[in-house]
């Protein structure tokens, strides 16, 4: 399947005030300066994986029994889910294995799929506890996913209710909550964690692409695009109280390549276009966005995201996308995921100051204040997602 083209640029609706570009958190000095090809384990291409056994870790019956025991023990404490951690969700044998998987996510391939849970056996709150408890071994901190918002959100098929949900939320209903193709992108946060409560009936495969492999491909075929990605791009924040900002799409910190790639902040979406006060995106930058999307598609790993799977990925090194999907009618058969954004104090990458400032805010809250949304409701997409 060819990569979907990026959206055309249009002007902002009447009444939207001109944004002011701030230089307070510029990362211009952190544009990538790496010399030569990247040969680390993160520079993989999809074709090198011979089968799902290369990246899918299957839970044994003993592992699942240990998870169920941890679930019961945590419920007996009466603690709120915000207190879920390796100390309160004890997995004596599985826990050390999960910590090794966290190392793979931070230092090797950059992603992993955990398989073997049966979400239909758990109640709604129990699925939340199980997912959050397991995930706490991958990253010990959870980030809020919008201003003063929850740390856990739902990705749900709202394709038949788009207009209703957008009016209800007074906001844009992101591609993640529709059945259409979800283009390659990165999000906010260090680790993106997804738990599949209900897979799509048809389609909806996950696509992952290594930014390190994309960089190597560009180095050989389009070095000019690398130079473009290192430029000072003007990002639309889509938040009236937050000024737009300037940041390259390819960054470097401590010798690590960091990719911060999205489409919406530069070209907008239907109904929520880019702020006209920022000016149109230069043609060579739009070409760079398209080129990265095309290469990501070419080099990507594609796999089925099955009911019960938990997917963990390094958001700083991997671009992700999703194929179009179809579901039967009825809430019980709609595609439904739970989502966490995480970081790990021990293994997290250091970030350039501007990016660090934005991401740190996600994790600066008390555990008592962590919110978990119990029923599927769309999250307002406000920060370029």
UniProtKB/Swiss-Prot annotation:
Keywords: Oxidoreductase. InterPro entries: AlphaKG_dependent_hydroxylases, TauD-like_sf, TauD/TfdA-like. It is an enzyme of class 1 (oxidoreductase). Its EC number is 1.-.-.-. The keyword Oxidoreductase applies. It comes from the Eukaryota. Pathway: Mycotoxin biosynthesis. One of its GO terms (molecular function) is oxidoreductase activity. Taurine hydroxylase-like protein; part of the satratoxin SC3 cluster involved in the biosynthesis of satratoxins, trichothecene mycotoxins that are associated with human food poisonings. Satratoxins are suggested to be made by products of multiple gene clusters (SC1, SC2 and SC3) that encode 21 proteins in all, including polyketide synthases, acetyltransferases, and other enzymes expected to modify the trichothecene skeleton. SC1 encodes 10 proteins, SAT1 to SAT10. PANTHER family: FAMILY OXIDOREDUCTASE, PUTATIVE (AFU_ORTHOLOGUE AFUA_4G13850)-RELATED, GAMMA-BUTYROBETAINE HYDROXYLASE-RELATED. Trichothecenes are sesquiterpenoid toxins that act by inhibiting protein biosynthesis. This is Taurine hydroxylase-like protein SAT17.
